[in-house]
Regions:
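Beta-propeller blade signature
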Residues: 43-48, 101-115
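Asp-box/WD-like beta-propeller blade repeats and closely related beta-sheet repeat scaffolds
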Residues: 35-75, 81-89, 93-98
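Short loop/turn segments immediately following beta-strands, especially the blade-tip
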Residues: 44-49, 155-162
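A short beta-strand motif characteristic of beta-propeller blades
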Residues: 6-12, 52-61, 119-124, 166-172
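Conserved beta-strand positions in repeat-built beta-propeller and related beta-rich domains
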Residues: 1, 23-24, 29-37, 79-89, ...
Length: 179
């Protein structure tokens, strides 16, 4: 993949299931990967010397990441990523989401990684199958798709430690068709 529209170039191969990717303002590729042992937020860089891929976040507070499902980058360099559920990662994203739809545990979370500070903070918890992320055109609102609750939550992109459906977490769209 080349952001400049040039020739195709294979820049990486990943072990596991690539579940989402997004380019940041610098042209770096951020991706979420799920392996049987857990998830990883990775960054791939490509320049005239070649490609480098690094696992940036693989655990939070000493616990391995669950099943990662989505990534979105902001113009300020911050990287938002979703853990769909705390269900076991060994069978991949589809299996984890199916399990969440049946069990409805609401253990999905959205985090933000700040590359300049090298910190991870929780933005939103209590999501029943976080499956997608998007920033508004003005980059002030983060949208989170919630498969289990069949809705899209909207939160301030700078908010921290919110709960799905709680204070300062609005339902942008609800009653979506689903399971």
């Amino acid at each position: 993949v080349r952001t400049d529209g040039g020739d195709y170039a294979a820049i990486l191969s990943v072990e596991g299931e690539l579940t989402s990717f997004a380019f940041d303002a610098d042209g770096d590729l951020w991706l979420t990967v799920v392996t049987p042992s857990g998830g990883a937020l990775c960054r791939a860089r490509h320049d005239s010397w070649g490609t480098s891929v690094e696992q940036v976040v693989t655990q939070i507070d000493g616990a391995p990441l669950g099943v990662l499902s989505a990534v979105e980058t902001g113009p300020d360099g911050k990287v938002y990523f979703a853990v769909s559920t705390e269900a076991a990662a060994k069978n991949g994203l589809e299996s984890a989401l199916r399990t969440e739809l049946i069990a409805h545990t609401g253990t999905g979370c959205v985090y933000v990684y700040d590359p300049s500070a090298r910190t991870v903070e929780q933005v939103l918890g209590g999501v029943a199958g976080a499956a997608g992320l998007a920033l508004s055109e003005d980059d002030r609102t983060l949208y989170v798709s919630d498969l289990g609750n069949r809705c899209i939550w909207s939160v301030d992109a700078d908010a921290r430690e919110l709960t799905a459906g709680g204070k300062n977490c609005g339902s942008f769209v609800s009653g979506l068709p689903g399971y």
